[in-house]
């Protein structure tokens, strides 16, 4: 059985790790980096770039370069968060036929799971290159505050990438696993995991306990905001630069897509620099042009100014912290350790805010970029049966229920319930002789169903005619270990039942997923063909170079006919590598190889003759160095002489 890898599918960056025995290994990608930008670019020729290569070309290809797609996953186009992103993103966000938020690239609409699958495929390939074997199973992390639709969509992305997703686990929980197995001391401890990433914020209160030699990780509560992260911090800087430039130069950069992409890059860089220095220069020559000529942007940004720009964003993380503490029933004084996760947690102002709230210094010995992937790899080892000393008890982040008479949300499973879990409740009809009931499922904390997230609906039909309130309809909610919901309804009188796995009344259908899997496989096959063509071209080119060099040195030893034959074969290869026909390139390269055999024979004969001449001259030339070496007493000369003779 192959390894189960751990993948942190992040909004801004992604990371992959694997367990080797008792040690975790964060795997470097093909560029040698331990994290990969979650950026995907679609080229004109159909090539798909992922990671650093996609990020490098973003400025020149902004409309077809996708980033922060995780913020759209499992969301409806009409949601206010999506509408906010439409005005900010250089790429097009469109409504799918089912009402989901999709993206449009080069005239083609794509689902966020399909785009995220490209990043997952890169992570899969990274692991395969390191392990030297095929990888088919993974544990993928999601923000703890992701709802059912978002979890399901992440699982779909894994399938499209060719992965069997063994478990979806929450990012703070994964970070706690990494911390618990690496840094955790003796005895039971309560920890707070503050996870401020590129696009999402989570806070989880977790108890780590030693139960009969088994380390138990129990999530006491979780809270967060799935639309708050580093991307929002970048946007505050971009808005500031645009306002300053407009004030200074009278030009509005907000409508210039190319300029916006450069500003995005500069804002991210400035934000990172200001974590270590008090001031930075944002210098972008030729940012735009008007009738008077090119315009250059040069703005100084201080740490104090940045902090004032993002103060409200940092403050927004504190309310979920308060709620999580209250839900867990613990006071600040009972928290033993505060763990910081996510790239944004490196910002000094964020660290100060966390310290003020929890009344203690957060731990700095956990890598905020890698801890989540490491935790996922540990969970992979547990699921693979290689590790028996870890038990993970996670929770559902939001309450789940159904709509009942008057549009009320009747909660079946309350938030922060340990999963997996199952709960049943009996309901009845609202009207006389009602032949069917519609079960509408919602997720959220509001009292009225309409204020919560609709997850789906289904009907239970064939209820015998009877007065209202008489039929006994048992509704069962069952949440699996991935946090994904299954709902059933049963008429106790007739035994009729209907069950569904909640697929949001949007989401991808099975047919759509299968088509995307096939497209992904076709792309992989196409990529393989492209690589093979490149390799054939490289071999042909290397062969031409080698033969040319040999021909210059030994061509005069060949007769004219042989030389012409080789030159013609070289020309054929040079012509072939201008095209993309792999078989033709390989055939022409083989012809050149055969034609140049005579040249190889001449070279070999010439080298043998030289060696024979050198060996014959050896004894005569041996005396002088010996006498010199005695005079100079230099052993090195002897060694050199022996090397030549050999």
Curated annotation (Swiss-Prot):
<protein>
    <recommendedName>
        <fullName>Chaperone protein DnaK</fullName>
    </recommendedName>
</protein>
<feature type="compositionally biased region" description="Low complexity">
    <location>
        <begin position="608"/>
        <end position="624"/>
    </location>
</feature>
<keyword id="KW-0346">Stress response</keyword>
<dbReference type="Pfam" id="PF00012">
    <property type="entry name" value="HSP70"/>
</dbReference>
<keyword id="KW-0067">ATP-binding</keyword>
<feature type="modified residue" description="Phosphothreonine; by autocatalysis">
    <location>
        <position position="200"/>
    </location>
</feature>
<dbReference type="InterPro" id="IPR018181">
    <property type="entry name" value="Heat_shock_70_CS"/>
</dbReference>
<keyword id="KW-0143">Chaperone</keyword>
<dbReference type="GO" id="GO:0005524">
    <property type="term" value="F:ATP binding"/>
</dbReference>
<keyword id="KW-0547">Nucleotide-binding</keyword>
<dbReference type="GO" id="GO:0140662">
    <property type="term" value="F:ATP-dependent protein folding chaperone"/>
</dbReference>
<dbReference type="InterPro" id="IPR012725">
    <property type="entry name" value="Chaperone_DnaK"/>
</dbReference>
<dbReference type="InterPro" id="IPR029047">
    <property type="entry name" value="HSP70_peptide-bd_sf"/>
</dbReference>
<comment type="similarity">
    <text>Belongs to the heat shock protein 70 family.</text>
</comment>
<keyword id="KW-0597">Phosphoprotein</keyword>
<dbReference type="GO" id="GO:0051082">
    <property type="term" value="F:unfolded protein binding"/>
</dbReference>
<dbReference type="InterPro" id="IPR029048">
    <property type="entry name" value="HSP70_C_sf"/>
</dbReference>
<dbReference type="InterPro" id="IPR043129">
    <property type="entry name" value="ATPase_NBD"/>
</dbReference>
<feature type="region of interest" description="Disordered">
    <location>
        <begin position="608"/>
        <end position="646"/>
    </location>
</feature>
<feature type="compositionally biased region" description="Basic and acidic residues">
    <location>
        <begin position="625"/>
        <end position="646"/>
    </location>
</feature>
<comment type="function">
    <text>Acts as a chaperone.</text>
</comment>
<dbReference type="InterPro" id="IPR013126">
    <property type="entry name" value="Hsp_70_fam"/>
</dbReference>
